[in-house]
Design a protein with these regions (language model features):
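Intrinsically disordered, low-complexity regions enriched in Ser/Pro/Gly/Gln/His and often acidic
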Residues: 7, 23, 65, 73, ...
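N-terminal "first-domain core" detector
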Residues: 5-51
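Acidic, low-complexity intrinsically disordered regions
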Residues: 10, 26, 57, 68, ...
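Short, intrinsically disordered low-complexity segments
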Residues: 51-132
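Short aromatic/hydrophobic-glycine micro-motifs
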Residues: 45, 101-102, 149, 170
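Long, contiguous binding/interaction regions
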Residues: 2
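Broad structural signal for hydrophobic residues in well-ordered alpha-helices, predominantly aliphatic
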Residues: 39, 95-96, 168
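Long, compositionally biased intrinsically disordered terminal regions
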Residues: 11-12, 120-197
Length: 197
């Protein structure tokens, strides 16, 4: 599958996100798909918790160190969805990336070591992980090279996050900007026992 043609990005993607409330923690998932409800079903979200809302409303649930898993799910670009974990430890990438879907997971936690790197999944399996402190590039190497993104040049959390966000903008065909942030999405709660066996 070829990547989309990208628009010009806001240069400092991370500064834009952190200035809108994500400076303590950001956990974002980009996954191929066009049906947010289907993604929520795969995540075993509680359908009764569904709330269609804007960014300002969603951020009322932003509690990055809570154990309650709250996600905001919506369309990112044609054939791509985005899931922001507003609360909780983050989602399991395996099930969402099943059936050939590409998935990227990016996490930043100011209180727990900063940037946790960029993970790439496809067909339910990890296909690459890159970070300043760990490096198993795998299939990510091709994407970094194709889009001329040099993550090795990052000297701090901000520049590292920017390199990943720019790569994701190129791959998905959409960068983060005001229109992206203000697009309505759907809030869901994932029950504590959703992944209990």
């Amino acid at each position: 599958m070829t990547d989309n043609v990208s628009p010009s990005p806001i240069e400092d993607q991370w500064e834009f996100l952190s200035s809108h409330g994500f400076s303590a923690r950001f956990a974002g998932t980009w996954v191929e798909g066009s049906d947010p409800e289907s993604a929520a079903h795969i995540l075993r979200a509680d359908p009764a918790s569904r709330l269609d809302c804007d960014f300002e409303t969603a951020m009322q649930w932003y509690d990055p160190y809570s154990s309650e898993e709250i996600v905001w799910v919506g369309v990112h670009a044609p054939e791509w969805l985005h899931i922001i974990s507003l609360s909780g430890v983050g989602i399991a990438p395996g099930p969402l990336s099943a059936d050939g879907r590409r998935l990227f997971y990016l996490e930043y936690d100011d209180g727990e070591g900063g940037v946790h790197g960029l993970s790439y999944w496809r067909d339910g399996k990890s296909r690459g992980q890159y970070g300043r402190n760990s490096n198993t590039l795998g299939e990510l190497e091709v994407l970094f090279n194709r889009h001329n993104v040099d993550a090795t040049a990052a000297q701090d959390d901000e520049s590292e996050l920017n390199s990943y966000l720019h790569l994701l903008g190129h791959v998905t065909g959409r960068f983060i900007d005001q229109d992206w942030l203000m697009s309505p999405r759907t809030l869901y709660r994932i029950p504590d026992d959703a992944w209990s066996w």
